[in-house]
Amino acid sequence: MPVKQSRFGALKKVSGRLKQIWLGRDEQSQPRPMPRLLVVDDEESICFSMSEYFSLQGFRVDTASELEEAEKLLGVTNYKVVIQDLRLTMTTNQDGLDMIKLIRQQNPQTRIVVLTAYGTAEIEDEARRCGADAFLRKPKPLSQVAQVVQGLIESPPRQAARPA
């Protein structure tokens, strides 16, 4: 007697095939390497929506909701882009600024997009001094975040900071 496939299993199979078509792949073509993306935000709904959106755009996405979790991931994975909030705790931007510095020390080629609701000109200047490539204020449509990410990926590699 044949095994009956669940509706969820059938949907998952169709969803996987649609994703292949969307990304321009079929069984005969070689898959393109998927750029790695890390989303760091204490709001899990933002991590989830960005993960889903960028996965459909052809990225391999990891998420972290705390600084310590992000540090662990950054220690074992080379990300093309990190999209991060500045306030990973409820009180200060320092966690996010420290993370930018950490990324710059560990992998200067990683592109950093800051996405925060606490964006003043002073905070943006500080984030850029720490090494952020782009600074966006929440709320921002995912399509606009994706345009910024794609622009950074297509731009020339970051030059390492030169000692004074």
What spans do the regions from the language model cover?
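Short amphipathic alpha-helix used as the core "switch/output" element in two-component signaling
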Residues: 72, 93-109, 129
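Non-catalytic signal-transmission and effector/linker regions of two-component phosphorelay proteins
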Residues: 1-36, 105, 143-164
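The short loop immediately C-terminal to the conserved phospho-acceptor aspartate in CheY-like receiver
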Residues: 43, 87-91
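Acidic, metal-coordinating helix/loop segments flanking the phosphotransfer/catalytic sites
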Residues: 63-81, 89, 105
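Two-component signal transduction core modules
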Residues: 82, 112, 135-136
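Alpha4 helix (beta4-alpha4-beta5 surface) of REC/receiver domains from two-component response regulators
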Residues: 94-98, 118-136
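Two-component/phosphorelay signaling modules centered on CheY-like receiver
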Residues: 44-62
